[in-house]
Amino acid sequence: MANTSSTTSDIVVRARVLIADDEGTLLEFEAENEHCLMRGAHEVRVIASPELDALHNGPYNEIALGDYTFHFNLVAANRFGAQVMLFAKRDDIKVSGAVFRLKVWNSKKRAVAPPHHEPEPVPAEEGAVADRAEPESGDAPPSPKKQKLDEREQD
């Protein structure tokens, strides 16, 4: 269950750029203090920083660094702010240092997609006639096959 009686955040994290290259930027969010978390939801306060502005410009992937999941939301009113909920899967999870990462993809670079591989056509066996994919213009559509019935069903 979420702790709703407290007005302070469970965890405070600060964003820093871990790697920046042509493909994008890897942001790492580090906790300022060590925390021992119980199972359930915990609010994570993200300190506003210019590094978070890049998240508004392109897609990003979330990477958890422990036995928990998290949900990351951008704030429309503040391009340098974010809201995070962390969901601990079990009791007594120690959180310190790097808590989670976000991989921000470069939106200015053209979209790179994995290559689409078409299945290779199977060569026809020797002496066998290859199937035609579509009927030719003069061909009639194939007629439906008739079902054989027993003598009792025919009566």
Curated annotation (Swiss-Prot):
| One Pfam family this sequence matches | TLP-20
Question: InterPro entries attached here?
Answer: Telokin-like_Tlp20_baculovir (IPR009092), Tlp20_sf (IPR036731)
Membrane-spanning ranges: none
Q: Where is this region: Disordered?
A: 109-155
Among SUPFAM superfamilies, the record links this protein to:
Tlp20, baculovirus telokin-like protein (SSF51289)
Name recorded for this polypeptide: Telokin-like protein 20 homolog
